[in-house]
Amino acid sequence: MDYQNNVSEERVAEMIWDAVSEGATLKDVHGIPQDMMDGLYAHAYEFYNQGRLDEAETFFRFLCIYDFYNPDYTMGLAAVCQLKKQFQKACDLYAVAFTLLKNDYRPVFFTGQCQLLMRKAAKARQCFELVNERTEDESLRAKALVYLEALKTAETEQHSEQEKE
């Protein structure tokens, strides 16, 4: 009997792998309805807003695993990582979200913030410049310009200090 269970488990695993390889999500494979995913997202978002980051991370991680094509889930997990000061992980997740979102430059903007917090001003500048040049979201462009201006001011002050020495 154990041999049959083992064979059937292997076959199920193989079928799941085949489905995922062809673009299906685990949500689809397991037949999880979208309204359940939406409910889980609502809980994750609520935990995030309450500052309960460990709980939010657990929910967003589950959502990402079960539907890796939904950029909202990836953005949520990235935002949690950013608040937990896991900046490189947040940058990696924002990169995934950007590939899913195509012309939405919010992930690039948030990556710029993370780069600044990792003290990588040149990379941060590249992110904010890209947002400034390419986004159609005027509000996001304005925020990027504020960061670019602050970086410029900081550079000017740094050069002034170096000249005094």
From Swiss-Prot:
Subcellular compartments: Cytoplasm
GO molecular function: identical protein binding
GO CC terms: cytoplasm
A UniProt-annotated Pfam family: TPR_3
Keywords tagged on the record: Activator, Chaperone, Cytoplasm, Transcription, Transcription regulation, Virulence
Top-rank lineage group of the source organism: Bacteria
Presence of keyword Acyltransferase: no
InterPro entries per UniProt: T3SS_Ca_resp_chp_LcrH/SycD, T3SS_Ca_resp_chp_LcrH/SycD_sub, TPR-3, TPR-like_helical_dom_sf
Keyword Transcription: yes
Main localization (coarse): cytoplasm
UniProt similarity note: Belongs to the LcrH/SycD chaperone family.
Subunit structure and binding partners: Dimer or higher-order oligomers.
Function statement: Type III secretion-associated chaperone required for SipB and SipC stabilization. Prevents premature association of SipB with SipC, which may lead to their targeting for degradation. Along with InvF, required for transcription activation of sigDE (sopB pipC), sicAsipBCDA, and sopE.
Name of the featured protein: Chaperone protein SicA
Organism, as annotated: Salmonella typhimurium (strain LT2 / SGSC1412 / ATCC 700720)
Gene coding for it: sicA
